[in-house]
A protein has these predicted regions:
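Hydrophobic/aromatic beta-strand elements that line small-molecule binding cavities or substrate pockets
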Residues: 64, 82-87, 100-102, 116-123
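A solvent-exposed, acidic/Ser-Thr-rich amphipathic alpha-helical stretch
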Residues: 33-90
Length: 185
């Protein structure tokens, strides 16, 4: 049996990696957190695009709940279509890396593609293949989130400047109006 409820049990490393990859992508895109974490090692370390580090399947579940599924999620929708750039297989363990081609819609309606880079380490523990570590990152100096933040900052700066300008105009108008009319200051 290549796949059980407990995870991927295919003895051939390359076939097992392909099966595990398919399970992870499908469960992620379908928001099936139970299935996703069932493919993680009990000691898994996951580093997300925002720099947050999760330890163990429960840490991943907690992150998912807070960011995606909870009462006030940051992310409304997401999808990923990862492409492996390369992979090194060393018998019972392997390292893969590539591009996630990940797309997001935030709760405020902002949509963007990150094209996060990833590195994943998987290993066979007994008969079952599990993810040992996963790291996703984005270019800190050039990514769509920076543009969203800059746009929001510019919008709010403009609104605040307009309010201050209106208040200053009203105050200055009253002061100058009093001077012209000869009213005491």
């Amino acid at each position: 049996m290549a796949q059980t409820k407990q995870g991927v049990t295919e003895p051939d490393a390359l076939k097992a990696i392909a099966l595990l990859r398919g399970e992870l992508i499908d469960s992620f895109n379908k928001r099936d957190i139970d299935r996703l974490v069932s493919n993680l090692d009990p000691d898994v370390i996951v580093t997300w695009q925002n720099g947050e580090v999760c330890r163990g399947p429960q840490g991943v579940r907690d992150y998912y709940q807070r960011m995606i599924a909870g009462p006030d999620p940051v992310v409304k929708t997401f999808s990923s279509d990862p492409v492996v750039a390369d992979r090194h297989v060393y018998g019972d363990w392997a390292v893969s890396w590539g591009n996630l081609h990940d797309q997001y819609e935030l709760k405020d309606g902002e949509k963007f593609t990150l094209n996060s880079l990833f590195t994943a380490t998987i290993a066979r523990r007994g008969d079952v293949w599990k993810v040992e570590s996963f790291h996703a990152s984005v270019n800190a100096f050039d990514n769509p989130i920076l543009g969203i933040v800059a746009k929001k900052a510019a919008t709010w700066s403009g609104i605040i400047a307009a309010i201050i300008g209106v208040i200053a105009g009203v105050v200055l108008g009253r002061i100058l109006g009093r001077r012209k009319s000869g009213a005491p200051q």
